[in-house]
């Protein structure tokens, strides 16, 4: 055994310096716990064996007075028991079940320390009281075990092992050594209480230190790291000012300043946004051209440079003037329907014409479902062959949809050219119609109301799908929809028979009817009622056959037509100027079974449209087909031209007849 260390002596002296109540000074107890835990291996333990070994310690028991002996023994027992109880506190906690831990045993453990302090003159306890005596088994603790603990005192404490002594032997101790041993027992009881008190105080602090050590262990000093932020501040020499994020050596988080990354500030350069960048950033339509004054105003808006959120986007659009009724001027009325009225207007922002679709809001029902569908679908469709929704204005009584203005539709276009369109223009319009439908079908949007009145034709010759009031998104799996869709002339036979289970093929039948009308100049199936419409279809295409058209023939509404047999009337006789490829594509559109109809994506690759598809296959969705090389609209022979041509032909005939009459008379 080695000699008793002076560090241990100082720690013991600090423990006993508090007088009769050493618990009052909490800081001294914590310091003592740290000294015990951080002592090196050279500071060896001091136990009862070292007290009794006169040769190793160097100080004999007989060299000291009786009072100093008692004080020294009391002091040694206190320090030893403190370390001994630290060893107990490092042991795992044994959790007892509620049924195993009796309240009577808990009271016995709490009152154990009081019973150890009984004087030697106390009366002898009864047999049932002798069972409450608790003797603490003290184990030795080595300095190596103490060094493994970070603080010397752990946060978990376990009650000392209870060995109930049932011995009835009560002898009076007469020697000073026996008296000192009894005081050592008292000190041992106090050490247990002291250890429990310190452990409870240390439990909260250790948890905070573990969190702090867990956070600081991830920090490493690095010279190569640097963060550059933008600022308008420059130094006196014209260079950027290097700013430290902390003004003192002590940071708020307790991290040393050497771990803080240096932040260099540089001058912020004002970025100027172009019109195309603003349109892309604010998701504006491609055909909407902002004036120069509006672009300059947006460049001065601080929200444009900030990260784009929904709130910042709305703020920027409001700065421009979107969402405000005063931005648009109402001019004249274009048409009126069940729920809405369409006006021609002018945008004060861009000084261009727009179409204002005013939807009346009922006080109880609110906005009609057709308007909600149209808004929800069009706001996500951005294509050159789909009409563009510019703005939405909501008031108490009206919901105004602002569209791009197109002055005529396909029906008006066919009437203007006396229903005799150029074949090149027919191919070009059909390709644009299929291109827009393929875009919508790819996004699982069904138009469900295709007709020439809903296909807008611009002055350049661009075709745009419009009036998505009956459109809806197709869900997966296929849902049942209403059969009261599509104008009667362009409604497929399965829908006429009451089918509500359909998909994108509902639009392809209407494409075939529109193609025939552009070529022939008249409607293919102009029925007045659903029954008359089905009769026209069966007489033209022939009666459905159960082996080839089971979906049609199994419908209960088909029974009145089951006994009627019609032979098909070849359509090629009605449209003689169409070629074989065009007629083949037309018949692929007009199929009884919806699954047999060609899709829009397949139709654009058909040989009838190959010359246009080759030149337009590289275009983006937002680009018009007229931007491709070699694609243009041919000049149509208008109705006025037909009238003037007939008058010239009539005048020429009169001149010839007059010349013949003059010649014969002269003869």
From Swiss-Prot:
Belongs to the protein kinase superfamily. CMGC Ser/Thr protein kinase family. CDC2/CDKX subfamily. ATP binds at residues 334-342, 357. GO terms for molecular function: ATP binding; cyclin-dependent protein serine/threonine kinase activity; metal ion binding; protein serine kinase activity. Residues 151-164 have a biased composition (Polar residues). It comes from Caenorhabditis elegans. Mg(2+) binds at residues 454, 467. Its main location: cytoplasm. Interacts with cyy-1; the interaction is required to activate pct-1. Residues 1-70, 85-184, 642-667 are annotated as: Disordered. InterPro entries: CDK, Kinase-like_dom_sf, Prot_kinase_dom, Protein_kinase_ATP_BS, Ser/Thr_kinase_AS. Its EC number is 2.7.11.22. Binds 2 Mg(2+) ions. Residues 644-653 have a biased composition (Basic residues). Serine/threonine-protein kinase, which, in association with cyy-1, regulates the trafficking of synaptic vesicles in the DA9 motor neuron and probably also in the DD motor neurons and in RIA interneurons. It comes from the Eukaryota. Keywords: ATP-binding, Cell projection, Cytoplasm, Kinase, Magnesium, Metal-binding, Nucleotide-binding, Serine/threonine-protein kinase, Transferase. It is found in: Cytoplasm; Cell projection, Dendrite; Cell projection, Axon. One of its GO terms (biological process) is anterograde axonal transport. The keyword Heme does not apply. This is Cyclin-dependent kinase 17. It catalyses: L-seryl-[protein] + ATP = O-phospho-L-seryl-[protein] + ADP + H(+); L-threonyl-[protein] + ATP = O-phospho-L-threonyl-[protein] + ADP + H(+). Signal peptide: none annotated.
